[in-house]
Amino acid sequence: MTQSQYRPGPDANGLFGSFGGRYVAETLMPLVLDLAREYEAAKADPKFLEELAYFQRDYIGRPNPLYFAERLTEHCGGAKIFFKREELNHTGAHKVNNCIGQVLLAKRMGKKRLIAETGAGMHGVATATVAARFGLPCVIYMGATDIERQQANVFRMKLLGAEIVPVTAGTGTLKDAMNEALRDWVTNVEDTFYLIGTVAGPHPYPAMVRDFQSIIGKETRAQLQEKEGRLPDSLVACVGGGSNAMGLFHEFLEEPSVQIIGVEAGGHGVHTDKHAASLNGGVPGVLHGNRTYLLQDEDGQITDAHSISAGLDYPGIGPEHAYLHEVKRVEYVSITDDEALDAFHATCRLEGIIPALESSHALAEAIKRAPKLPKDHLMVVCLSGRGDKDMQTVMNHMAAQEKQA
């Protein structure tokens, strides 16, 4: 396994193999080129890195723990399961790792206004949080469907001073919110910084977001070394756009002994038209500035994604994931809504931790695999966020089940 094979970049054009790139309107091209230049300069600037480390430690609360899930391990009766506790970060998810990095870059570039898209609302909350901390006005684009199912996060964003713009186009979900945010950016290129929440979008976003999230994997390596004296045997993380997964995976891509599993949202099943599994049920195409795997119909039109989890409800996936899928370094599987809900309840009851429905997809895959593995197998699951935001969804689901019973 060589560096050039699994951690190739991206190259100067933002490509991971044939995926990624910069498919943007002419008006945006100077902006993304400028952003790439500024990001490269920031990465090489010790002052920027020092400031980033300060906020990671004192504002986000890093490092967060790598926790041995003893009762879940006993319940499964196989592999030793560890949780990387991203839900303990300030704002309750991994999203803030990226937001703090990007807001420091926006500040460095002299931008006066932040915009962002959000699905589950966690990236919106994290963006509104850093906007408040740095005194910047902030506009969040959110699909009307997602606003409906994520009322608590909408209120949190408003409390933090953000303006929320409901998007009714299409299915009123993340894809549509991202379209609107891109339109805003084209119109306000001079003073506005677009804070993309996942490893998608035009170059340099996929690489930049991955880099800001890669602290997850770096901490995991050091923490497991301290606890067990060795590398993990497997890593499991949920994948929508895929930033928590890339954050965990990137550190280990060149370690051939580490098996890496990305978990897509299988919705009602990948054999139906109600899922969000782009790699297991999609084909390559271009969306939101990059070439990747997408859910599309025979005419190449983007089809609607479905997942019980608003954060995985996206018809594409980050281009680096598409590349890692094609070169077979990472195995991508899917978990249904029902399997994710079962894992959600099991984690609540066994560990006293209420996980996000997104993270519950990764937990479900871990629960499936662990019993078949030896007791000395070390498995790390990324607990990407907490489940407070999902209470209404779970309550509705339980009420519907009781009616059927």
Swiss-Prot record:
The protein's name in its UniProt record: Tryptophan synthase beta chain
Lineage: Bacteria, Pseudomonadati, Pseudomonadota, Gammaproteobacteria, Pseudomonadales
Names of the cofactor(s): pyridoxal 5'-phosphate
GO cellular component terms given for this protein: cytoplasm
Function of the molecule: The beta subunit is responsible for the synthesis of L-tryptophan from indole and L-serine.
InterPro entries registered for this protein in UniProt: Trp_synth_b_CS, Trp_synth_beta, Trp_synth_beta/beta-like, TrpB-like_PALP, TrpB-like_PALP_sf
EC code(s) of this entry: 4.2.1.20
Similarity-based family: Belongs to the TrpB family.
GO molecular function terms attached to this record: tryptophan synthase activity
HAMAP family per record: Trp_synth_beta
Class in the EC hierarchy, top level: lyase
Pathway membership: Amino-acid biosynthesis; L-tryptophan biosynthesis; L-tryptophan from chorismate: step 5/5
Keyword tags: Amino-acid biosynthesis, Aromatic amino acid biosynthesis, Lyase, Pyridoxal phosphate, Tryptophan biosynthesis
Catalytic activity: (1S,2R)-1-C-(indol-3-yl)glycerol 3-phosphate + L-serine = D-glyceraldehyde 3-phosphate + L-tryptophan + H2O
